[in-house]
Amino acid sequence: MQGKKLPVYGDGKNVRDWLYVDDHAKAIDMVQEKGRLGETYNVGGHNEKQNIEIINIIIETLLEMLPENDERRKLVSKDLITYVEDRKGHDRRYAIAPDKIKAEIGWEPETMFKDGIKKTIAWFFEHEDWMKHVTSGDYQKYYEDMYQNR
């Protein structure tokens, strides 16, 4: 919410499987407790979405969550979306099949996608000092090197 461009690789149609962080952490805990040694367990959220769709959902959710009189609303816009050159070898789709972890361990995501986005945004609102720290200095240089100079 700084009014900066929102870089999107390629055409933004790369697909990823999205999972709320607490659900991911719970899956890891359950694998440690109940998983079989040497086995691999895929953790997925059954939420395959295109990157551009995620950005649009985040923008829409921010506008829903910010009060009408909040000055930060002016800094949230789909007009900030900027398409940048795709990375070489960038996978078009990551597909996760979490059937095994559900069958063997009983794990499945509990948080609905939209609720996870809202919780994530709320966390960032509650930790604005942290946000200021990671968007300055070394992190900012990394961001500029990765996205703004493409």
Please describe what each predicted stretch is.
Residues M1-R150:
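C-terminal substrate-binding subdomain of Rossmann-fold SDR/epimerase-dehydratase oxidoreductases
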